């Protein structure tokens, strides 16, 4: 992340990369859904499994590429059972999110930016609460999709969303 941060941030400047990221995530989810048997639990994971899953997590630094989608899909593709794949993905999110927060705080301190003063405490707290509630329901929904072998529906949603974003970016220019 630190090594390619500037290049990755440039990718967020255009909506076309968002559309491509949504479509890419949908493809990865569909491939993982259709991958072979998923029978290995945490005790049967190989030493290489976390390294491969962590590498997939790094791909999610790209715009609109889902971190949990990448980690869960890579675990499923490696033959790890669905519940273990989801649990491992959410455990991996802790250091990734903490690292992102530390990096953002460092940038704010370095540049002298004071988001708290600029935005205010109440909107920040309210935003955090809404994000936590939305995140909780998103995680619950994702776990149900994983357990019920219905990632294909989420893939279709991502393909449609990606197509709409690309259509807007390349033709309509309503949002971008």
Regions found by a protein language model. Name each.
Residues 1-176:
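Multi-pass membrane proteins that catalyze or facilitate reactions on polyprenyl-/lipid-phosphate substrates
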């Amino acid at each position: 992340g630190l090594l390619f941060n500037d290049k990755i941030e440039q990718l967020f400047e255009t909506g076309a990369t968002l559309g491509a990221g949504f479509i890419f995530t949908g493809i990865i989810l569909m491939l993982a859904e259709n991958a072979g048997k998923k029978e290995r639990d945490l005790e049967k994971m190989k030493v290489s499994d976390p390294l491969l899953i962590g590498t997939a997590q790094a791909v999610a630094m790209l715009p609109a590429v889902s971190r949990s989608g990448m980690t869960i899909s890579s675990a499923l593709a490696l033959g790890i059972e669905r519940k273990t794949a989801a649990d491992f993905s959410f455990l991996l999110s802790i250091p990734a999110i903490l690292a992102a927060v530390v990096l953002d705080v460092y940038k704010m301190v370095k540049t002298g930016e004071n988001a708290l003063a600029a935005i205010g405490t109440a909107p920040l707290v309210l935003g955090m609460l809404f994000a936590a509630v939305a995140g909780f329901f998103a995680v619950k929904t994702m776990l149900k999709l994983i357990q019920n072998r219905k990632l294909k529906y989420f893939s279709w949603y991502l393909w449609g969303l990606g197509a709409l974003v690309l259509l807007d970016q390349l033709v309509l220019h309503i949002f971008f």
